[in-house]
Amino acid sequence: MTKSSIMRQRAEEFSSLIEEKAMDEEHLVRIVLNFDDLTPTDEKTGIPSDLQKHIPGHLLFPYEDAGMATGAYLAATSLHFRLEESPDALRRAKKAFHAICHIYELGKKGCCEGFFPKPYGGKFSTHTSRDQYLFAMSGLFEYYQIASKPEQEKIRHMLAKMAEHWRTINYSLSYFSLKKQCQLCDYIAPMFLGIACLPSRLEHSPECTKETERLIFSEKLGEKAVDTLTARFRRGETYDGACYFRQNENPLMMKSLAMEHLWNAMPAHRDLCRVTLENLASDELFLELSTQDGLNYYIMRYNPDADSLELTPPGRIPELTNPLNLSFMTWGGDRRRAGSTQSVFAAIIAASYLNDPELARKAEHILWQLTPDKFRGIFCSSPEHIPPGYEYMERVLYCNYICYWLWDYYLGKSRKLW
């Protein structure tokens, strides 16, 4: 078999796995399964209840990023159908669309229209996050291209209400024990540019355009977009109390996705998008990559003397802030996982708009490296590199990263990058 046919077969196997094993009865994508038998997690999996004690860990964690995973799967299957008109892809996309609508209705009934909750245990919760919104909204946008007229009308309404919700709450929220605070001040705040402008990709929306302009200039999200962690550290600044890259592939994916929407919704800001993507590609893309296996290191320290990243010994890193007191957030060592799927997404966006074929080739190579066995929850050289209480990571399959792999693969194909 050729490399191309192997990748295509892998994509079909991944798509089938998500549909048949990871989706629950409402077609929400659980972000983890038991690795050995691909069954839903249970008490025996050993996931700690470290965020909300009254919800068992095996019900809470699989749904922590279910909105993101389902949105990514919706985008991937929609792109797949547009490319090949596959009946299987259309069926899967419709299931994922149902799931996103289900979460939307949970928020509407439990709080207000436009609130998109984290559906712990498949049910309503008072918690959400901006990345859930951006992924779900992006999935809806891709599905819109293949949706029926009634579905398209529903999607336009949902996107408008979801963007409006953030304006209504002044981009502020609380999360478990964390106090309510504005989300516009940190490094990943530029993702809101994607949320704010996305409805205007489907219909004329002076309100969304005006709000996006306000965020760019008055809230200085334009300045934040072109900045990078590397640049901050070179200026002698810190982030989260120190100079570490900690799961930085997530901000990279969010920022590049926001630039994707801004580029197309508001062409006047393409220079901002271009500089943002150039800085992302030159300063941060693939810094955390383990080239031997295509996985990303979870946490790495910036060394100002060498102007490079380095691993730290296993153990708690006291200088890093950890307001939720989660050991995995500040535990050093050489643990790795398939977060590189998010780095690849950012590379695809950058390669598309910067016309960089070498970046596209590197992205494709990483996808090639990520064989099915690479989606285990954690890889490390010895047990002491596993954060205390998180031994279960060796026993789970990360389905969200499989969904991101699929989105990467079909997005790259749709842009003729491979």
Region annotations inferred by a language model:
Residues 27-62, 109-129, 174-193, 231-264, ...:
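Carbohydrate-binding/catalytic loop surfaces
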Residues 62, 68-82, 122, 135-139:
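Non-membrane alpha-helical segments in proteins
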